[in-house]
């Protein structure tokens, strides 16, 4: 892998997807234009797209493990402008709303725990 892309990826992960593109470029020892071009060539995505995916995965993981999490609190914690911004981005990447995903996660967790109890009792 290109060391510039590796440094950029590390900076984006370290910043949980909230690091501005200009700071990612600085960490990668590149200009913004060069970094954007390399990202697009290697992955087909922009730096901003990848940052958005990093944040989306954090929201998804939080909601999977804690379906009752407060969306406004998550939005603030993960650097979204507001809850509506979080919801739009979540739907963009997953095709569903964060609230619907959380409800589904809660149902699945309940089903898994019931299956486990039935397995242990058998």
Regions inferred by a protein language model and the residue ranges of each:
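Generic alpha-helical hydrophobic packing signal
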Residues: 22-25, 30, 58, 62, ...
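…primarily DNA-binding HTH/wHTH and HhH modules…
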Residues: 64, 89-122
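Residue-level detector of family-conserved "landmark" positions at structurally sensitive sites
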Residues: 50, 85, 101-103
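Short hydrophobic clusters on alpha-helical segments that form packing/core surfaces
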Residues: 8, 12, 39, 43, ...
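DNA-binding recognition helix and immediately preceding turn/loop
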Residues: 3-49, 67-78
């Amino acid at each position: 892998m290109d060391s510039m892309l590796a440094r950029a990826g590390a900076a984006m992960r370290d910043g949980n997807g909230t690091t501005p593109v200009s700071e990612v470029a600085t960490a990668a020892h590149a200009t913004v234009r060069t970094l954007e071009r390399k990202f697009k060539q290697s992955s087909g995505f922009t730096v901003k797209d990848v940052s958005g995916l990093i944040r989306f995965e954090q929201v998804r993981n939080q909601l999977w493990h804690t379906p009752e999490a407060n969306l406004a609190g998550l939005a603030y914690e993960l650097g979204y402008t507001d809850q509506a911004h979080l919801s739009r981005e979540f739907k963009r990447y997953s095709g569903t709303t964060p609230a619907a995903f959380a409800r589904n996660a809660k149902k699945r967790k309940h089903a898994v725990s019931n299956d486990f109890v039935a397995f242990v009792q058998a």
